[in-house]
Each structure stands twice: as C-alpha cells, then as structure tokens.
Amino acid sequence: MLTFQQIILTLQEYWDKQGCALLQPYDMEVGAGTSHTATFLRAIGPEPWRAAYVQPSRRPKDGRYGENPNRLQHYYQYQVVLKPAPPEILDLYIGSLKALGIDPAQHDIRFVEDDWENPTLGAWGLGWEVWLNGMEVTQFTYFQQVGGLDCTPTTGEITYGLERLAMYLQNVESVYDLVWTEGANGQRVLYRDVFHQNEVEQSTYNFEHSSAEMLFAHFNDYEAEAKRLMEVPLALPAYEAALKAAHTFNMLDARGAISVTERAAYIGRIRNLSRAVAQAYYDSRERLGFPMLRNKAGEAA
C-alpha cells in the first residue's frame, strides 16, 4: 500500500522523468493549483514550460468541521503543467497511474467531458474529468484563455485530487483514515492525526469568528495595492495582492457576508485584476524578449 506521502513521491519521480521542473507550493492561500504562478502566469505568452508541484488549496466555504469524510476546507492537489501540450498527454497521464500501481486493463478509467472555467482568473479551457472506478480523481484541461488572453501555444494542465486518489488506493471511506506515513517505530500517522483539528478550528473560524468588517477593509486594500503595483509596473507583486483579494473574497463568501448580487460584482473586480496582471506579465516577458524561447532555440542548435 502506498502512503499519502509515497503517492506524492511517486508522482514527483514520474514527472521528473518527463522533464518537469519540480517546484514547491505557492506560499500563499490559493483555491487551486491553477493559481500558482507556475500555471497562471506561465500559461501566458509563447515560452515553453513544464512544471509539477503539490499545492495546498483552501476553499473556506467547503469546511465541514471535520465531520464530513470527503469534504475539506484545506486539501492537496498535485499539479502538472505542460506547455505546449504534447500530443501524447493522455498516454503520459496513464503512465503516471501505472507508476502508482493502477493497471488500466483492470480498472474502469473514464474521461468525462467537463469544460473548465475560473471566473476570478478570467480563465477557461476544454477539459475532462477522469473517473477511476466511479470516483473522480483528476481534471484535464487544455487552456484556451488565461487572464483574458488567448493561450498560444495551448497549455495542458493535469490536476490530481490527492486525497481522492489516496482514498481509492488505500481503499478507505474517510479521508481521515488515510495513512499519511508509517512512522519510524511502525506506528501509522493518519490524515486525522495531521489535519483533523485544523479542519475543526478553521471551519469554526471561517463560518463563525472571522470579522466581516476587517475582511471588507482588507479586500479594498488588496485591490488598491494590486492596481497601484500594476502602474509601476510590477506584475508579480500585483498578482500576489490580487491573490490576497481573492482569498479574502472567499472568506467573506464563507461567512455569508456577501449577497448574491454583490457576489457577482466582487468576482468581476477580481477578474479585472487578473486580466490586468496577465497583460502586465505578458508585456514584461515581451520586453525581455521571451527569454525561454531563446533557451529553446539554443538547445535546438
């Protein structure tokens, strides 16, 4: 049986062999691996890029006080970004399942059409959910736009839901029963031991004790800071301010502090920031002469 951390190590080793830069998680609150600069910003422009990383993801509204067996406000994704998307991307994915000990000939693996959109990032793509014996474990996306900019060349994104994948591989019904690792003395460390208290307390904070007044003020401050930084222009610091605004919005949404009509307006404000950041980043890379294109040309020579 693969432990949770062995699943991560296996994926790291596999995608390392496919020429991916193995990066670290983005060190800010994000709702998905797509928000990491290694995906959102690197999907912009013509430069080639291959990367893989684990991303802790926060979705405050999905918290259930540690009482739901598969619903969490903090969870893990394993993200793979391939640009340009290679024609054999599906074969590469199947290869990763084989590395995890999953034989496609003995399992029901289905690709269910599910186009993807992230309104706050101004991003969308053609995609598929991957179902393994009836459980969704991965999302495939071919990005068409990011930050309102067309993706040329197309970026391929593979997002593994690590908890769901591990629940299948370990044959458990609750995420909290997952074996994180086998301790030095043979004692198992469970997902429950690592994260259950965090789910209880963070859910309590998100739903009951966060200050809406403070969060509204923070949102306005982060939005203003992002706009100010883009005038410099400093695309990367501006993007971090936009990410902070997005997480603050998610906290307000979980707190029930934003009405349905206000929600659409706030999403629009974040989307405007994302689009402005995307354009600023593209412009900055263009001024540099798209250096990774030169690197590729040098390798070809």
UniProtKB/Swiss-Prot annotation:
Picking any one GO molecular function of the record gives: ATP binding
This protein's source sits in the domain of life called: Bacteria
Protein's GO biological process: glycyl-tRNA aminoacylation
The cross-references to Pfam families, in alphabetical order and at most eight, read: tRNA-synt_2e
EC number of the protein = 6.1.1.14
SUPFAM superfamilies per record: Class II aaRS and biotin synthetases (SSF55681)
Please give the GO cellular component terms listed in this UniProt entry.
cytosol
- Catalysed reactions listed for this entry: tRNA(Gly) + glycine + ATP = glycyl-tRNA(Gly) + AMP + diphosphate
The answer on whether this UniProt entry bears the keyword Ubl conjugation reads: no
- From the Swiss-Prot or TrEMBL record, state where the protein is found: Cytoplasm
Q: Which PANTHER family match?
A: GLYCINE--TRNA LIGASE, CHLOROPLASTIC_MITOCHONDRIAL 2 (PTHR30075:SF2), GLYCYL-TRNA SYNTHETASE (PTHR30075)
Subunit composition?
Tetramer of two alpha and two beta subunits.
Instruction: State what protein this is by name.
Output: Glycine--tRNA ligase alpha subunit
